[in-house]
Amino acid sequence: MRWAVLGGGHWGTALAVYLLRQRHMVQLWGRRAERLPCQPGRTDLFPVFPECARPEGLHCTVDLAAAVQGGEGIVLAVPSHALRGLLTHLLPCLPSTALFVLASKGLEVPSALRLDQVLREILPEAPLVVLSGPSFAHDLMLGKPLAMTAASTDPTYAQRVAEAFGSAQMRVYTSDDVAGVCLGGAIKNVLAIAAGISDGLGNGDSARAALITRGMAELHRLGTALGGRTETFMGLAGAGDLILTSCSDLSRNRRVGLGLGSGLSLEAVLRGIGEEAEGVRTAQALFQLAQSLGVDMPITEQVYRVLFEGAAPRAASDELMRRALRSELHVSDDGTPGGAARTE
């Protein structure tokens, strides 16, 4: 297939190189030429992967129309806040039959829309598959095995992406739960910040395990309230991605939490990371959704308070530990397991 990968960061570059290794034709697009990993005269993937050799046949461009011309598939790998603008600019030059693969994670702020919903507002009829799961660009670049989920309301599109991306390195499962796969990939980033804060405070491995487990309860409560399915949240796009992002220092969201828990300001942490950490923006949208839907999300609420209200990380951690005691399998007044309705 002929693919256009839109997004010249680590994830977009890794996906472009991976597709090239699977013998697809690939154009990699980015907004700024100096940030694209195809610098003239260089044989590596500077600046995103300077330690990796540039594969023969990888083409880079800042011309959006040229990138998608003749494309059979378009991979979207841009930050959540850039997606709407990119799609709007894409409209005049869009190939009529292109299959979209949404590989970005997050929620739009301030609308709190899922990213597939953003795409549907602009391209309501476009064939769409959401590709998500526990995966780091670094692992993909180094040829390490991983598994992902390809979700679409049309099973033929999901199968087409599974076949295009699937290999001995990447196992791709299919799903029809687009909402659940999108939400799992977004919510886990905020919970990973919480895990990082806990570790930055020195709370230990036991506390991290508790946060991940109770974070899964929050992911399930909000995710099902927004139309996702339980089995999705227990799978690769939910629990799998949450575990990876919460436990590995390759995770930018975890590193945000580590910095905050160690006493750094948010500005200093983000400056040190130097790249987008989707969980920061997503925390705003999740807090907004939880409040409007009456969903109990105490971990998310404390992350929001640390990020945007100046709450001290230690005080936020202590607040979680001092919550009123209740059954782990709490059922709310509306009969929803886990307390879908807010309970004080």
From Swiss-Prot:
EC number: 1.1.1.94
Pathway annotation: Membrane lipid metabolism; glycerophospholipid metabolism
Subcellular location: Cytoplasm
GO biological process: carbohydrate metabolic process; glycerol-3-phosphate biosynthetic process; glycerol-3-phosphate catabolic process; glycerophospholipid metabolic process; phospholipid biosynthetic process
UniProt GO molecular function: glycerol-3-phosphate dehydrogenase [NAD(P)+] activity; NAD binding
UniProt-annotated binding residues for sn-glycerol 3-phosphate: K105, G133, S135, K188, D241, S251, R252, N253
InterPro entries associated with the record: 6-PGluconate_DH-like_C_sf, 6PGD_dom2, G3P_DH_NAD-dep, G3P_DH_NAD-dep_C, G3P_DH_NAD-dep_N, NAD(P)-bd_dom_sf
Active site per the UniProt annotation: K188
Residues that, per the record, bind NADPH: W11, R31, R32, K105, A137, R252, E278
One Gene Ontology cellular component annotation held by this UniProt entry: cytosol
UniProt KW keywords: Cytoplasm, Lipid biosynthesis, Lipid metabolism, NAD, NADP, Nucleotide-binding, Oxidoreductase, Phospholipid biosynthesis, Phospholipid metabolism
Main localization of the protein described in the UniProt heading: cytoplasm
Coiled coil spans: none
Catalytic activity: sn-glycerol 3-phosphate + NAD(+) = dihydroxyacetone phosphate + NADH + H(+); sn-glycerol 3-phosphate + NADP(+) = dihydroxyacetone phosphate + NADPH + H(+)
Job of this protein: Catalyzes the reduction of the glycolytic intermediate dihydroxyacetone phosphate (DHAP) to sn-glycerol 3-phosphate (G3P), the key precursor for phospholipid synthesis.
Alphabetical list of PANTHER family matching this protein: GLYCEROL-3-PHOSPHATE DEHYDROGENASE (PTHR11728), GLYCEROL-3-PHOSPHATE DEHYDROGENASE [NAD(+)] 2, CHLOROPLASTIC (PTHR11728:SF1)
UniProt family annotation: Belongs to the NAD-dependent glycerol-3-phosphate dehydrogenase family.
Protein's name according to its UniProt entry: Glycerol-3-phosphate dehydrogenase [NAD(P)+]
